[in-house]
Amino acid sequence: MKNFEPFRIVVLFVSFVCFPLFADAVEPLTKPVKAIVLPDGALHPDGMTVNPKTGEIILAVPVIGDKGNAWLLKIDAEDNVSNYFELPAHPETGRVTPLGISFGPDGNLYVADSQCLGGNPNHKSRLLRVVHEEGKPVRTEILVTGITQANGLEIFGDKIYVAETQIDPMIVEMPMTSGVFCFDLAEFKSELQAVRRGRYRTHAPGPPPVLHVLPYQKDPHFIFSFQTTDADRNGQQKVGANGIGLSKEGLLYVANFGDKKIIEVKLAKDGKTVISNRDVNDGKGPNESVDGLKVCPKGYIFFADYVGNAVCVTNPANGKTVLIAKNPTNPNSEAKNAGALDRCSEVCLRGTKLYVANIDLEDNNAPHTVSVIDLSGIDFDALLK
């Protein structure tokens, strides 16, 4: 694709090396109907969100291992792919690794830059804002620095929730701690600055103040933490908080990747004080992990299972989990062109279709795709009761 700089994978973190288990066979509901083949260089598609104004899906393509800028792509109503915006690299690390993305009520796009997955775990991850003017992306602002491994991101009301996959930059022994940051949009108001226009001086919005968070749960923005044990696999999956989403009632859902669970967090009216939390499933369903997730209007949670190379849906009311689609790992190019899942990491709902990003952190073989699953005709109310 024009202006798209190719990159290749160099480094994989131990925490993302997979040791799949052979669980009891469960027949999936359906299978992907097609693949959206991405341009050369878009090796590791991940975060997705729907632009509320245009209906286009915005897709994050992180730079992993190599250095350079990263592209956000867009998928239109006919599933055509094109460039959306180029994210500049971190000035110190030389790369940018966008994972979770979401539009705010201000019309701007917020981005979790996971520098840890990109290659630098030393508290270099950031929260970014892609400023939009007249509906078009125009520039990037740095809002937060000091995060270890920013991952899933969601916005509810005036709050931005960001998953912190690990609080310690080192690979630690199990159990490991991870959690969630919460930021107020009001914290990132642009400051007026004096500018000269011809012979006159005036004021115009400048960049917002950059917030640097304290490490190891010391920052007041770090509102919730939990531990991952991965007891069933003897701690092989050292991945904690991952996907994140909220119901229309404001219940926060966080993926506990290694323990194969989803945690429900009940928040006070301020959106950041935790009242209670509980596991909505017991980790014994058909899934082998919980990666990126989305909460549908009915409250069901659709999620990617990276380890199991599958997509599932959970009813948080009763914990029932149903396998939607599943493929063998490391499919060949023919299968991928037909829509096969390939180490999927994120899902996105648009109409009756479920879009699944295949991050493919293992073999990294072309083509690089987003799988499309048709959900029409599936009675999830009956299946999940």
Across the structure, where does each feature detected by a protein language model lie?
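Bacterial N-terminal signal peptides
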Residues: 9-20
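Short, solvent-exposed loop/turn segments at conserved positions within beta-propeller repeat blades
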Residues: 64-69, 117-125, 170-178, 257-258, ...
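A short loop-to-beta-strand structural motif that recurs across blades of beta-propeller domains
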Residues: 70-73, 126-128, 178-181, 261-263, ...
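Short loop/turn segments that connect beta-strands within beta-propeller blades
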Residues: 75-80, 131-136, 184-188, 266-271, ...
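Loop/turn-rich, solvent-exposed surfaces of beta-rich toroidal or solenoidal domains
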Residues: 253-255, 261, 283-320
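Blade-level signature of beta-propeller repeat domains, shared across WD40, Kelch, NHL, RCC1
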Residues: 343-385
